[in-house]
């Protein structure tokens, strides 16, 4: 086992090259990028094999961190949630604007993403601001968070003891590389590499609380000196079409502004410029505006599910916090399929009957009808 000290972190970064994205965007966002590549064609298979050879001994990289109350407080407020957990009596509980969560408060599903953020000196970051941890060699340095899964093995509501990440605990993150596979984007014929990474999060008692598997897509780097064609904005659905699209569904609508994206970037220490630098996002990477973080959409799907599932099950009485509904899924599998853009409304939705099912299909759908993220939330004990 390797402890990820400052020196070790630097070695990993220098063994890789700069990346260009840390969220789930898709091939359609830069479908014409093949004319703007910064490097000549390379052998994806050879680069994948060279990347895996760096981790062929199965080494792990370990970090430890205190889950402090202020970080999770600011993170929840940035997501416009005044409480970490849905409450049955808001009047009896102070909001996060008024007070930090007390020690021992469980961290909601996927909110662990505000901890264990990238830790690199500025000179090691890519030109686009992204960190270079666990990257393949050039030219495959443009990273996108394409999907993955999160499991909460210690959150079984029927267990005598639950192993959860909680505020005030010192937690250990264990990271390992699982895979690196060459792929081809069907629409463009462009080569890419798909890297699988696994992160374990263990509490102070060394109990596994979260198993977080992430799939990163690495595409060929773009040449910033060559202008990018913008992604056209599709026509939004009419109000009648929007109303019809949510019939029989539980849903919420969002339109993320630049301030929200900037705060989310700061709290996750994500310096990728597509989230806050509009000229970079539009002129270099070809987006039509700044891009909403993929993890923000993942959390939105989980927030919708846990709020509705908690109400349906009557969770709250006798839970760890007065009047708070503490309820976790068993797991979620998710995949980003298209970017979500700042100041463009979109909806997170799932079928109403899904709260009474073992598996709940969740979707992030732009108001022009584009499906931007898909997820399947698995409950603990309900029948299919």
Residues covered by each model-derived region:
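Catalytic-pocket segment enriched in acidic/His residues
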Residues: 281-354, 367
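A contiguous, surface-exposed recognition patch within enzymatic or periplasmic domains that forms
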Residues: 40-102, 106, 231-300, 304-310
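Hydrophobic, proline/glycine-rich low-complexity stretches
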Residues: 28, 32-172, 313, 317-324
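HotDog/MaoC-like acyl-thioester-processing domains
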Residues: 6, 32-61, 147-256, 336-384
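Residue-level recognition of well-ordered secondary-structure positions
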Residues: 76, 114, 118-121, 176, ...
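N-terminal mitochondrial targeting presequence
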Residues: 1-46
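A broad, structural surface signal
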Residues: 18, 32, 73, 77, ...
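Long, contiguous hydrophobic alpha-helical segments, chiefly transmembrane helices and signal peptides
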Residues: 67, 108-116, 143-146, 150, ...
């Amino acid at each position: 086992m390797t402890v990820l000290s400052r020196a070790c972190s630097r070695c990993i970064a220098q063994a890789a090259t700069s990346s260009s994205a840390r969220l789930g965007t898709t091939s359609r966002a830069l479908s014409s990028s093949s004319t703007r590549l910064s490097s000549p064609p390379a052998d994806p298979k050879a680069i994948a094999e060279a990347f895996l050879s760096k981790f062929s001994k199965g080494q792990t990289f370990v970090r430890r961190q205190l889950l402090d109350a202020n970080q999770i407080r600011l993170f929840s407020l940035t997501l416009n949630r005044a409480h970490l957990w849905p409450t049955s009596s808001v009047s009896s509980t102070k909001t996060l604007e008024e007070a930090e969560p007390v020690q021992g408060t469980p961290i909601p599903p996927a909110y662990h993403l505000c901890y264990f953020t990238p830790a690199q000196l500025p000179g090691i970051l890519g030109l686009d601001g992204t960190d270079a941890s666990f990257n393949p060699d050039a030219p495959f340095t443009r990273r996108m968070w394409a999907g993955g899964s999160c499991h909460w093995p210690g959150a079984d509501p029927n267990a005598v003891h639950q192993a959860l990440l909680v505020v005030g605990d010192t937690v250990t993150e264990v990271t390992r590389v699982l895979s690196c596979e060459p792929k081809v984007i069907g629409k463009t014929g462009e080569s890419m590499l798909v890297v699988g990474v696994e992160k374990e999060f263990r509490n102070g008692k060394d109990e596994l609380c979260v198993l977080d598997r992430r799939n990163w897509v690495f595409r060929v780097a773009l040449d910033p000196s060559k202008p990018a064609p913008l992604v056209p904005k599709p026509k939004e659905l009419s109000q009648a079409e929007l109303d019809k699209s949510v019939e029989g569904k539980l849903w919420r609508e969002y339109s993320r502004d630049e301030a929200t994206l900037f705060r989310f970037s700061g709290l996750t220490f994500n310096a990728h410029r597509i989230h806050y630098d509009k000229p970079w996002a539009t002129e270099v990477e070809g987006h039509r505006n700044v891009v909403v973080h993929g993890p923000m959409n993942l959390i939105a799907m989980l927030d919708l599910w846990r709020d509705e599932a908690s109400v349906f099950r009557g969770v709250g009485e006798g839970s760890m916090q007065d009047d708070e509904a503490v309820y976790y899924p068993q797991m979620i599998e998710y995949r980003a399929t298209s970017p979500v853009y700042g100041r463009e409304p979109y909806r997170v939705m799932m079928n109403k009957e899904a709260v009474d099912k073992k598996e709940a299909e969740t979707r992030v759908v732009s108001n022009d009808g584009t499906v931007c993220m898909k997820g399947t939330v698995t409950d603990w004990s309900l029948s299919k």
